Amino acid sequence: IVFGDWSSDVCSSDLSRINTAGHIKARLKETGKRPSAFISASGTGYYGSVTSDRIFTESDGPATDFIGEVCRRWEKSAYEIGNLGIRTVIIRTGIVLTKSGGALERMVLPARFGIGSPLGSGRQYVPWIHIDDICSIYIKAIEDKEMHGPYNATAPGHINNRQLMETISVVMGRPFFFPAIPSFMFKMLYGERSSILLNGSRVSPELIIKSGYSFKYPDPESALKNLLCQH
């Protein structure tokens, strides 16, 4: 969705999730069956693609931009299932770092060619999480009967794009000294989707930590070494 065609991919996914949730709710009402929990995916885009002094928590409302509205609609459809008396958990996921695909694949390209540099201003925050941690959080949400409502799934601490890109270069043993890659280049390549890399909010994971979750990869260096180094 992040790097697909927003005019079709995201809209199709939006409708698909809402329609699927509606079908699930209708079927549950028809059969009278009630699962022990309903776990739904959302994103930190719920808070909007902004860089500011604010640190967002689960109590903050949705942004009015495109992605914020998409996330709001996803969550609304999930809570309609929760209205049936089913424990409902919403996982607001940050940028998932994984070995292949996704945002990290785009981020490492400059470093691979020895031209590591920030993307755009470099001041934008990156609310990230390692793939292993997000999977573990979903498992916890299924098993932990005390969990309900929204949870931010982002690694502890806050890092901006310049810091993350420099860490990528260091982990890969590449230089990091080139001027920032201009924002307009990403806008030319990805259009509106470029906001995923060029903007970002600080998002607090304190609620999931208070629930008892301990991050396997709490800092970008350990996460990137796991993902980018040969084992």
Give each language-model segment a name.
Residues 21-65:
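Conserved Rossmann-fold NAD(P)-dependent oxidoreductase catalytic core, especially the SDR/UDP-sugar
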Residues 108-116, 124-158:
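Alpha-helical substrate-binding/gating segment
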Residues 144-192, 225-231:
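Mid/C-terminal beta-alpha module of Rossmann-like enzyme folds, strongest
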Residues 72, 84-86, 97-106, 141-151:
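Glycine/proline-rich active-site loop of Rossmann-fold NAD(P)-dependent oxidoreductases
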Residues 15, 51-90:
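Catalytic helix-loop patch of NAD(P)-dependent Rossmann-fold dehydrogenases
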Residues 195-231:
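C-terminal amphipathic/interface module of NAD(P)-dependent oxidoreductases
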Residues 1-11:
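Single conserved hydrophobic/aromatic residue that forms the stacking wall/gate
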Residues 62-67, 94-101, 121-131:
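Glycine-rich "substrate-gating" loop/helix at the edge of Rossmann-like oxidoreductase active sites
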